[in-house]
Amino acid sequence: MRVDLFDFDLPEESIALRPAEPRDHARLLRVRPGQPFEDRQVFELPDLLQPGDALVFNDTKVIPAQLEGMRERDGNISQVSATLHMRTGPDRWKAFLRPGKRVKEGDRIRFGHSGSSCFLGTLDATVAEKGDAGEALLVFDLSGAMLDEAIASVGHIPLPPYIASKRAEDERDRKDYQTVYAREEGAVAAPTAGLHFTPDLLEKIKAKGVEEHFVTLHVGAGTFLPVKADDTTDHKMHSEIGYVSQRTADALNAVHERGGKIICVGTTSLRLIESAAGEDGIIRPWAGATDIFITPGYKFRAVDLLMTNFHLPRSTLFMLVSAFSGFETMHAAYEHAISNGYRFYSYGDASLLERADKAKDTA
């Protein structure tokens, strides 16, 4: 499909720069294809679910993966920014470098505070390989837990570009840009639909008889990359590492066997569950990379509902929700959201989407 079909006008003031307080007081737009939109709030979510349903959360934890450093070559020094997006070994990460053209294979980069003599104040790396679109493989002088500690010391939370262009990252973001259930370190970006959940809301969901299950997809910086192709068939998704345990797969399959629904919290959970599901709809264990790219025409295998934030024009995530609930339905839903003051993007409001083909089946 043509990428420009997924374009729409989004006023700058619609982009949220801070999350709602409390988290679960963000607005929630309920979208059921063929029915009127419902304006709700996230704390009402238990009222929209049924006992026996299951919520699927992504428990990845955001690391401070934005590094600022200096590259020295032949006496010339230039500033380099790196956004780590995939760990490939104890001492190496794939990263997006800016400006990528200034960096060559073999270059040495020193990240952090150049005046410090302590390894926690600086972090050195070698550019081992260069790829496309500013991507490079960095091999660090530290590895394992020592590398993790150094990244935590010198790194910054990599706020999405549309927020970072408006304000600097601050200490508050280290809490705001993390779900309350995050536990598996490795993400560059938060699974933002999960940011709306509070411990109190999770308890109310359990009390309703709704199951909670966790998967892990380490969200990479590729989620921020714009779609530069004119047609969706020419866009290549960056892969991300994910895990679905045997126990979780069995539990979710049992939900369907009992007639319950699987509700993914966030597009990351959905992409992982759909990667792990076969054409028969059975979810199987998963451990590895996925680069699944969901656009209209995709036949969903396992996920019944999706809770997700409001996404940017021409983004792969708006393409995904258009595939899930219908192209025309989602354009209308976003028009409703914009005209009614919903807040967009990572710190914005949420939507609860029903699958278009499920809506037809139950109409």
Swiss-Prot record:
Keywords from the named record: Cytoplasm, Queuosine biosynthesis, S-adenosyl-L-methionine, Transferase
EC number(s) reported in the record: 2.4.99.17
Broad class of where this protein is predominantly found: cytoplasm
InterPro entries for the chain: QueA, QueA_dom1, QueA_dom2, QueA_sf
Subcellular locations according to the entry: Cytoplasm
Pathway: tRNA modification; tRNA-queuosine biosynthesis
Annotated signal sequence range: none
One GO CC term on file: cytoplasm
A GO molecular function held by the record: S-adenosylmethionine:tRNA ribosyltransferase-isomerase activity
Alphabetical list of Gene3D superfamilies matching this protein: QueA-like
Gene Ontology BP terms: queuosine biosynthetic process; tRNA wobble guanine modification
Catalysed reactions, semicolon-separated: 7-aminomethyl-7-carbaguanosine(34) in tRNA + S-adenosyl-L-methionine = epoxyqueuosine(34) in tRNA + adenine + L-methionine + 2 H(+)
Quaternary structure, from the entry: Monomer.
Entry-linked NCBIfam families: PRK00147.1, queA
Family designation: Belongs to the QueA family.
Function comment: Transfers and isomerizes the ribose moiety from AdoMet to the 7-aminomethyl group of 7-deazaguanine (preQ1-tRNA) to give epoxyqueuosine (oQ-tRNA).
Name used for this protein in its record: S-adenosylmethionine:tRNA ribosyltransferase-isomerase
Organism: Brucella anthropi (strain ATCC 49188 / DSM 6882 / CCUG 24695 / JCM 21032 / LMG 3331 / NBRC 15819 / NCTC 12168 / Alc 37)
Lineage, uppermost ranks: Bacteria, Pseudomonadati, Pseudomonadota, Alphaproteobacteria, Hyphomicrobiales
